[in-house]
Amino acid sequence: MDSSSSLNSTSRRKFLTASGGLLAATVAGPHLASGTSGGSPDARRSSSQNSLPAGAARKIPIGVFDPVFDHLSLDEMLDKVAGYGLEAMEIGTGGYPGTKHCPVGELLADDAKLRAWKKKFDDHKLMVATLSCHGNPVHPDPKIAARDAEIFQRTVLLAEKLGVQVIVGFSGCPGGSPTDTMPNWATYRWPPEYAQILDWQWKEKVIPYWKQAAKFARDHGIHKLAFEMHPGFVVYNPMTLLRLRDAVGEEIGANCDLSHLFWQGCDPVEVIHLLGKQGAIFHAHMKDTVMFKDNVNKYGVLNFAFETKDLSQASETFRAVGYGHSANTWKEIVRAYMDVGYQGILSIENEDPILPGEVGVERAAYVLKNVRAELLGSVA
């Protein structure tokens, strides 16, 4: 049952005000209550401005990224997602997300199987909005690089057949020299050898590969390659994303996953305006991050935790939407996507160690449906 449908406008506003850090403390226990929700982009707006003018914004579809349902069959997953009242899906086609719900080779080889696969989504009124093949096609190990480059190409071919316009992934990260065997994530240009590493990576590996890959995508009718700005890869913030876009072309854009930008100190609304006004946001992951101020003060921000056993010493960890930053903050984030005319979906990716799996998806969907309804002046 869609629990959000029973909220009236008054209770929804109370929910928007009260969620976020308070919910995190209630669900996760006292050691998380010291977390801070970070900046407050909602402070820019008058608290009385709850909704947008009629006709001012598109109702951005809310969806989910499928790896969180790897324990379910395709049919079971679709039943579950439709039951949450969601409208779209992001489907893994290889690389880190895997292919649990998308047998890429079979679908490329057999049009009848492709139609039957797509019909399952149509029957559940779910749009296949994006295909995701996060990998490292510029890995210094040539076997890994070739494997991930092939996964990308097969994803492009499948997107062409399905009429999907957006492919999501990582920029990748090369080694630091022609003889390296492991990736080298350099972010600081001193001592001098790090400047040499960065220059070599971009000029010799990253830009040449993505120019070729973007042409392949373009030749098959795909014009939106959405890079998640993720630590460990050469594109990890808006500046590096725009650098690659400037070098390769307008096929390069962002998968704007704010969970990786909160801890870097980025203002989410500023990021959306910066990239969105250039038409450079192609996809948006909905995932939160909670910052633990006491630990940030002691250890800095490069101190992430992925498991509950490490949280007492962590500076930050992933949370479901509304459990790291307030629902009012997320309302301003969704408002910003509407303001810049974003044409993609809001894709829930749940990696919350406290609300794992489907629980976090359901909580995030509840928050997002209600903030969207509040902005549009409608019932969730």
Walk through the language-model features, giving the residues of each.
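N-terminal secretory signal peptides and thylakoid transit peptides that target proteins
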Residues: 2-23
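Active-site acidic/histidine proton-transfer and metal-coordination neighborhood
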Residues: 19-31, 47-48, 76, 120-124, ...
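C-terminal segment of N-terminal export signals and the immediately downstream linker at the start
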Residues: 31-63, 67-71, 79-80
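Acidic (Asp/Glu)-rich catalytic clusters
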Residues: 52-57, 78-83, 108-129, 156-161, ...
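Acidic/histidine-rich catalytic cores of soluble enzymes
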Residues: 59, 88-89, 131, 190-327, ...
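Short, acidic/polar
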Residues: 71-81, 147-156, 266-274, 330-332
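Catalytic domains of carbohydrate-active enzymes, especially glycoside hydrolases
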Residues: 77-95
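Glycine-rich, proline-tolerant flexible connector loops at the mouths of alpha/beta enzymes
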Residues: 92-116
